[in-house]
Structure formats: structure tokens, C-alpha cells
Design a protein with these regions (language model features):
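N-terminal hydrophobic/helix-forming segments and targeting peptides
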Residues: 1-128
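Short acidic, glycine/serine/threonine-rich loops at helix termini
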Residues: 2-5, 89-93, 132-140, 182-189
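Fold-independent oxyanion-binding glycine-rich loops
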Residues: 30, 81-84, 110-112, 124-126, ...
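Glycine/charged-rich beta-loop-alpha catalytic/anionic-binding loops adjacent to active sites
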Residues: 45-49, 118-122, 128, 132-145, ...
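Hydrophobic alpha-helical scaffolding
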Residues: 53-57, 145-148, 206-208
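Alpha-helical metal-binding/catalytic segments enriched in His/Glu/Asp
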Residues: 67, 120-122, 135-179, 210
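Glycine-centered flexibility sites
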Residues: 92, 100, 124-126, 132-133, ...
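A glycine- and small/hydrophobic-rich beta-loop-beta segment
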Residues: 165-209
């Protein structure tokens, strides 16, 4: 834990800084095996970078590219479903939340070690920005809403880490990617959405999309 703490202490989000500040240079004794800590660091940094990124640049396409970059050559199967598929499969909730945004929704599925005896599923909330929709949040309530996709980022970080460590478990990750925005096409309080399981849901507050 001490070694991991040292490694994580070097994190800085400087994507928008014109001149990088001096980086911390931490040297480790070569006899210390820090591979596991490095895997953990990579996963944590992935989440931090995405959470810190402004919503202007955190588009669904950008998020998907970062997931592809993260898993790289790992034995993880990534499937990207687009809006056309979501409509065909009756994902009324995902479509409803996203329909006020100019950015189309996606649904990502990750699969690792599906033949393992012990299987786990993670579902991560991927609202890339949550204005509240027509049930608009207050200005102060929106200040941190670029972080409303932290659940999705964490789910992908976990499956990457599990694969890197070669754990003998099966893991599936499900993450919708949407923006909840107000516009003339947004869902309204009183609208009824039909979910994939056939149930209907009346929307009383468009900010209850989670």
C-alpha cells in the first residue's frame, strides 16, 4: 500500500496546461516487484483523467476511443452498440435520456474470461454530462456534472485490471453512454418510456435518469 501510495502521488491532470509543471521522479529498488501496483495505477489514472476531462471534449466517441486504448491487447471483448441498435432492441430508457442531446447514445459491453466458473457483472453509469434535462439543475448543481460518468469509467478500469492481473473470474461490463440535456427534443415530465423488459415508466423528473 505504501508503494502504491507513492506511485499515485505523482498524478497530475495537465491536459489544458500550456507548460507542464515538474514531474515527480520516483525511483524504486530493482528487487521490488511493482508490476501489480503499476497495473492498479494505470486503471486509477484512466478514471481520474476521464473524470477530470471537461464535458465539451468528453464525447461518446472520445470515451469509446479511450476504452479501446485502455484495453489494448488485453483478452477483453469490446462490443459497441449504436443508436440504431438501441432503437431496434427497445432500450427506451437510454434513448429517452439521450434524446435532448446532439450527441447520439451508445451502449458498451465488455467481456473477460466468460468460461470461468465464477461470473461477475458490473454496470457503470455513463452520463457524460448531466444538466438535469428539462428538470434543469441549478448552476451550482451542474458544476461537477462532468463527473457523472465515473461509474462507467470505473467499470472499464476494473475489467482492465482484472485482465492485467489474470484473475480467474469472469467479468462482464455494461455501460450506456449518454448526455442528459435540455432541448426541444428532450423528454418531458409526464412522458412515458418503454423499457427493454416491456415495462413502462412515467417520467416525473428528467433529472432522475440514473
Amino acid at each position: 500500500e505504501f508503494t502504491l501510495g507513492l506511485i499515485l502521488s505523482g498524478y497530475k491532470f495537465q491536459k489544458y496546461v500550456e507548460k507542464d509543471s515538474e514531474e515527480k521522479n520516483i525511483q524504486f529498488d530493482k528487487t521490488i516487484d511493482i508490476d501489480e501496483q503499476q497495473f492498479i495505477r494505470d486503471s486509477i489514472y484512466f478514471v481520474r483523467d476521464l473524470v477530470n476531462l471537461p464535458a465539451l471534449d468528453k464525447t461518446p466517441d472520445y470515451f469509446i476511443d479511450k476504452v479501446k486504448e485502455l484495453i489494448g491487447s488485453e483478452k477483453i471483448k469490446l462490443t459497441v452498440f449504436d443508436k440504431k441498435w438501441l432503437l431496434k432492441e427497445n432500450f427506451g430508457g437510454v434513448i429517452g435520456v439521450s434524446q435532448g442531446s446532439a450527441k447520439e447514445p451508445y451502449f458498451l459491453v465488455g467481456e473477460y474470461n466468460t468460461s470461468a466458473d465464477f461470473q461477475i457483472a458490473l454496470i457503470g453509469k455513463g452520463v457524460l454530462f448531466d444538466s438535469g434535462g428539462l428538470s434543469l439543475k441549478s448552476p451550482s448543481g451542474m458544476e461537477t456534472m462532468k463527473t457523472d460518468m465515473a461509474g462507467a469509467a470505473t467499470a472499464w478500469a476494473v475489467i482492465k485490471l482484472v485482465s492485467s492481473l489474470g484473475l480467474n473470474v469472469g467479468l462482464k461490463v455494461y455501460t450506456p453512454l449518454v448526455e442528459n440535456m435540455p432541448s426541444s427534443t428532450a423528454i418531458r415530465p409526464g412522458d412515458v418510456l418503454k423499457m427493454r423488459n416491456g415495462k413502462t415508466v412515467e417520467v416525473l423528473n428528467t433529472d432522475a435518469e440514473g
